[in-house]
């Protein structure tokens, strides 16, 4: 557990895995939990998730450091305990020109193998994200998985939910509130 930050600033390079087609360019950071750190629309010439050029951790995660920006992938609950730690990765070229990067780990809380796949297709302006969970334990394990995208808000910003969503939860399922109008403690 890391429970203090020094405030010391230093220049540092991180290993990046780049994915690119004619429409988008994506930067993945396996050293920082396998997050999408940057996603750039080459046609509109703009980032389509918030790109934070500075890695400045805050003590938000279960084991300490967490950073803002990009898209963070979380399991088994809360901001993933290993969100600021390196993950393993492998790359695959598909038979139809698609390119996939798999990032994953055996997470320490429940001993599950968790993988996130990022696929770019040559003729599409999208990132296909696939989650896989393998339980090699003798008993079932409780598990949550979600992506935490950072976007730049504004007057025209909207969050769209499926019509069957009637409740929202905080990080660890501690507090529940009605949706779309929050009531009670949250």
In which residue ranges do the predicted regions lie?
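Extended, loop-rich substrate-binding clefts of extracytoplasmic carbohydrate-active enzymes
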Residues: 1-11, 16-20, 68-126
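N-terminal start-of-domain structural block
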Residues: 1-38, 164-186
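Acidic, contiguous internal or C-terminal segments within carbohydrate-active enzymes
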Residues: 6, 26-44, 103-153
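Acidic-aromatic substrate-binding/catalytic surfaces of carbohydrate-active enzymes
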Residues: 16-20, 24-86
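Histidine (H) residue identity feature
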Residues: 37, 78-79, 96, 142, ...
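Polysaccharide-binding surfaces and accessory modules of carbohydrate-active proteins
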Residues: 44-71, 128, 134-186
């Amino acid at each position: 557990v890391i429970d203090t930050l020094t405030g010391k600033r230093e220049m540092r390079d991180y290993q990046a895995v780049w994915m690119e087609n004619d429409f988008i360019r994506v930067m993945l950071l396996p050293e920082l939990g396998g997050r999408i750190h940057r996603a750039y629309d080459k046609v509109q010439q703009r980032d389509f998730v918030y790109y934070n050029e500075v890695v400045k951790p805050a003590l938000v995660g279960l084991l300490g450091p967490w950073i803002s920006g990009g898209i963070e992938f979380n399991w088994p609950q809360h901001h993933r305990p290993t969100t600021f730690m390196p993950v393993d990765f492998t790359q695959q070229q598909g038979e139809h020109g698609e390119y996939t990067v798999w990032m994953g780990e055996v997470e320490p809380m429940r001993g599950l193998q968790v993988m996130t796949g990022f696929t770019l297709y040559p003729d599409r302006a999208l990132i296909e994200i696939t989650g896989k969970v393998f339980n090699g334990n003798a008993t079932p394990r409780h598990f949550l998985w979600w992506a935490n995208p950072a976007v730049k808000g504004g007057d025209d910003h909207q969050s769209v939910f499926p019509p069957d969503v009637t409740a929202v939860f905080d990080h660890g399922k501690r507090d529940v509130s009605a949706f779309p109008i929050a009531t009670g403690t949250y």
